[in-house]
């Protein structure tokens, strides 16, 4: 019986039929002949095509990966394809048949060397089964191609494509474009292949390293091909730009551009310093371990018990726990284990691993020399054409541009900018060396070689790319964008220090463009705040960007004090639309009107002066501090520049911005202590140690002082600080937050001339046009529910009345006020159906107009968003059903209006309409009176002449009265009729007025009735005064009238008494003419008396009573009203002089006066004059 092994039981991962077909084709392709050289088979070209079909069908369409594994197992690449290319390489261009075979072999090499990728969406079992084997096979392909000794395979691939490259662009066929593409893709695959991290290799990594690839590219003149293609992009080559971009990316990623252009001597010194620093770190680490390391005497071990504060005992083993209690506690903490639950994170696929550009790559001396020469030639000849063409392709989003190309574009832009800056510094150092014959020229100092990534178009594309990456959380893309932006800022900084004035002007212009956009400032702040474990490379990029941006912005803001930034904010834009005018008179209210003000929230752009302190305050917060703290935790792996970057930020937070409270957290304090005191802290011999030690000592002093001022800080050290906590710890009290009350929208009304049903139709039409049918349906549902409820109540009320009538005895009479005492139906509360509806009931003035028109009432303050809406008791079920019918009618049959107007044109702002109406009535009255003033006959009395009485003080400025109510609109006939009535009234008053200048002797014109009335009033006044005087004597008052008057005036001045004398109630000396005047003043908008509140009127009336009681002998009031020329238009008052001895009152029109509650103008001077005259008689 034959012996079997486990291999016999193992299942073949490849389908045997596929394996047989592929192996038979490879066998027929050719092999090694008797002479030791490779011999092609008779049907070699057909075999190559069949193998390509199998590869395309099996691995492309069926997605199995079986064919690629069979070809790897059969050693197709090294044993056949490379031998075929080496055999036909000398005559590949001349012989057409050989050229076809070479192209077929190259077409087969490209998919075999294409980096293996596992698509997480379309991956199958075969991908995971064959993936590691194929990856290792591809590394073998790369090693064979780079180390193949019988031919230069890469150079042969370029020779195959040379005939197609020589054809002009317009004359090339698709086959020529395909040959050029597969040759460049073959070069790209060789540069792209790297050893896998998931599978071990049995070959030397140096044979497939970056240095070996660069040396091979140099030996086989691939760099010259890349320079030729890149410099001719846009002229001879178009679709090949992205392939060249990928080749450059995989050649240059991870290479330090600073070291690349260093002099050999300086580079050796730098490498020696790095080695020294590493040895110092290792020595410090070993020294820290040696402090607690076991000695040769502890061969039996040690175990101790530690008694804690809670009387619990803990056992610790090891000699390192002996000595201090702190060492025991630290040992106890180290032995604690916490199995933190790990969430299944996103698995990093092969593409992301290949696209990683933060891992440094070491180069050999020869590789560094070759790549440096290539980069210098590329910057001189090919950088601008290639990157200009790529930027345009990315902007247009052409089909050949993929997502990864934008990331590679910005990373390479930053890399080449850094290389150019390093090259310029080296050239300046050479020029400064007297022993070096190198001399700088104007071209060497100019930055024109990298101009295509320093223009405005690139900045716009970069900003858009960074914002998109941040929104989509594509952190690798954002990392590349941040590196590019940082390097642009550093390049601009070096341009500003250039010796050429043109470069300085360009740098000033670029800085102005970058710092002008406030969105750029906000984006940098948000990127810094949003760090959440994206990796060390991302953390390094974001901290470097924030550091460089903040320092350059601070320097630029100091140089440009009047720096303006473009700010985008939410604003309210008011648009006014003027309706068409019709009719002859365009000034009439009904003919010209403005439509309602439409307020729309939109992004508005405005410029404002830049305040760096404001930006720095926004830049420094708890999230940004956490980002730098996370970066500082890698302090043992950071170089000097990175440590200084962290130190500058913490120094700004603690001392410049005086926000050291943000750093008062237990983990941050422990980190600072560990960095300085260890274990595993900073090396005291490192260049950054001194600065850090000084900062930590000052900061801890500040913390101790702050804890003494605010003991609450001890508790807050356990938590991150929010703004409210920061304010409390700084000031000792909480911030007072004042909430602004929301303002109600402007009230609307339908223009006059329409009935209520038509007005409802207008409101319904507006809501329908604004796509607010849901609000209309909600109002209708509320009305339907209210109508049913009101109808049920009315039915119950009728039943109650019928029952009461049946229980009443037959002979009992019904009381007359039964109807008045009958109960009213309860008001119905209007409830919103959602939170949006509740807000609309307050903010949507169109909806409020409809609710008001159908009968809803609003209870509460005007600006109260929570005010209640009700359906009043006055509305019966019939009224509500009528409103429902109107809503249904106008919803499906909206009314139409004349001249093509819409319902929006028929509504207006109620307050604006009231103001316009008031101004128009005033102007009409003034014009009519001015026109008719000439026609009025005042007889022998001259109107408007000033009295001889001297004024009491400086005349107060008159102000127009602000009315509370809205005046009623008047038509033309009514206005004419009222104006005519006013003119007649004024003529009658002027005819009856008598000035003291024209008063005759009383003996000539004797009127007994008037004299009797006058003496009767005087007697009544005298009696009232004596009664008041007696009451004051009875109460024991010793104050004089003058002191009481002064007290009254002082009290009124404290309560902000109005400037004009108050209204007097039922004065015995009030003329009928004066009352008429005041009624007219109250009804006429041109009246100038200020309106009074109820509190002022009550206070002034009590004050007047005191004055009338206590000052009977005062001749005139201190604050009397002085007449002016303008007062004659509303009614002339009697002119009175202090020397007058005889006064006659005109009160013939008492019967014509009508009572009115409106406050009238007081006549303080007349009362004083009458008192003096009566006493003299």
Curated annotation (Swiss-Prot):
Pfam families xref list: TIMELESS
Keywords attached to this entry: Cell cycle, DNA damage, DNA repair, DNA replication inhibitor, Meiosis, Nucleus
Intracellular or extracellular location(s): Nucleus
Subunit structure: Component of the fork protection complex (FPC) consisting of TOF1 and CSM3.
Comp. bias (Basic residues): 1054-1066
Segments of this protein annotated with the region Disordered: 332-353, 576-598, 802-830, 893-1012, 1028-1177
GO cellular component assignments: replication fork protection complex
Name of the protein this chain belongs to: Topoisomerase 1-associated factor 1
Primary subcellular site in the record, as a coarse category: nucleus
Compositionally biased region (Basic and acidic residues): 893-908, 935-955, 975-1001
UniProt GO molecular function: DNA binding
UniProt keyword DNA repair present: yes
Function statement: Forms a fork protection complex (FPC) with CSM3 and which is required for chromosome segregation during meiosis and DNA damage repair. FPC coordinates leading and lagging strand synthesis and moves with the replication fork. FPC stabilizes replication forks in a configuration that is recognized by replication checkpoint sensors.
Recorded family membership: Belongs to the timeless family.
Alphabetical GO biological process terms: DNA repair; DNA replication checkpoint signaling; meiotic cell cycle; replication fork arrest
Listed Polar residues bias regions: 1129-1140
Biased composition (Acidic residues): 586-597, 923-934, 1002-1011, 1071-1080, 1145-1155
Superkingdom, natural source: Eukaryota
UniProt feature coiled coil, ranges: none
